[in-house]
Amino acid sequence: MESAKGKLGVMCVGLGAVTTTFMTGVLMARKGLAKPVGSMTQYDKIRVGRGKDKKYLHYGEIVPLTSLDDIVFGAWDVYPANAYESALNAEVLKDRDIEPVRDELKAIVPMKAAFDRNYAKRLDGDNVKDCKTRWDMVEALREDIRRFKAENNCDRIVVIWAASTEIYVPVDEEVHGTLAALEAAMKANDTEHVAPSMCYAYAALAEGAPFIMGAPNTTVDIPAMWEMAEKTKMPIAGKDFKTGQTLVKSGFAPIIGTRCLGLSGWFSTNILGNRDGLVLDEPANFHTKEVSKLSTLESILVPEEQPDLYTDYYHKVRINYYPPRNDNKEGWDNIDIFGWMGYPMQIKINFLCRDSILAAPLLLDLVLLSDLAARKGRYGTQRFLSFFLKSPMHDYTQGEVPINHLFQQYVMLKNAIREMGGYEADEEID
């Protein structure tokens, strides 16, 4: 495995609430002024060995992870505000938690974004590249990555999407089925089938950087990008950060399934007032998120495996834009279940959470573990990162079923760390 020493450039697509919360937290942690609570790479321990040889180790004691001190931040955004201004505007963190790293945040000025307003109609920023074709976007982004890497003396780069959800792009086999077809579509400026996010992913992989899709966009979950990842020998991960309601769902649905209780319906609704909520208020963008959030139950409570329990259950997801809440998302779940002799029961879950506070540690873990995977020589879809994602990538062309079960995902994560560290895989959870 290649060394974790040297600078790691973390280039974020989007410099809004999630990204600035992530950056501020890392910068504060470096100064010993805050703790990166929620980060698996910083807190979780994995058992290695058995019996008298058993011990519990942090991830960084099993595999070489990049130090927080070696991270260098960069970003693209449609708005020109620097990270300090953006963090204040987001109103996620208190001023007292931003001011100690004010100078570092001010130095993070977003590059012009590769942006198509048709993909996010509620955004009106003008800090955008003037590109005639999607291929021009790719070339401009590649130049950004090369320049950032050189100017900051970075040894490695990871690119992560933390920007808004794009409109839904159905997978088109003719365009998305092969790398050659996708490249041709980019050069022909096929704006219907080639989303801006695909340009970021292509540019990252072409420049030898892993790419992580943190939104539910159709981006790296297409055969053309799998081919690109294999060609460049780079890891890809996606999609959609699993922060609040879906985290609860992927952890609670296994309780219903393990106990062999039946499900009649699961209704989920949210209120959210940040920029993400604004974009999702557009029906075409919400549909992208809806598809992602609806996919969670399908592989956990499977009708074909338990027809008496899970046939024809009703599953509905809604997100409502409500500005007074800003980043403080609230999720309600009403779960109608049935038990012995078919008698009905209900479960109610009310999760008052902070969207960016839950997302920030996911960005850190996904960045560090994607960099680890690249240094280990792993490439293509990194299924072990499914733990952090709402809609885990899978090869649907071969009938592969995604793993959404939180505890199965946790076993996958730990075993990947064990194996990369030279230890044996283990199916037990402890």
Predicted regions and their residues:
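Glycine-rich, aromatic-lined ligand/substrate-binding cores of catalytic
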Residues: 292-383
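Short, highly charged low-complexity linear segments
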Residues: 243, 308-313, 423-430
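Conserved anion/nucleotide-ligand pocket segment
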Residues: 237-239, 243-309
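Glycine-rich beta-alpha junction loops
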Residues: 17, 77-80, 242-244, 267-273, ...
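Histidine/cysteine- and/or acidic
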Residues: 211, 235-238
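Metallocofactor- and cofactor-centric catalytic cores in central/energy metabolism, strongly enriched
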Residues: 1-215, 219-231, 250-251, 346-430
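Short flexible/disordered coil segments
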Residues: 217-232, 271-282, 299-308, 326-339, ...
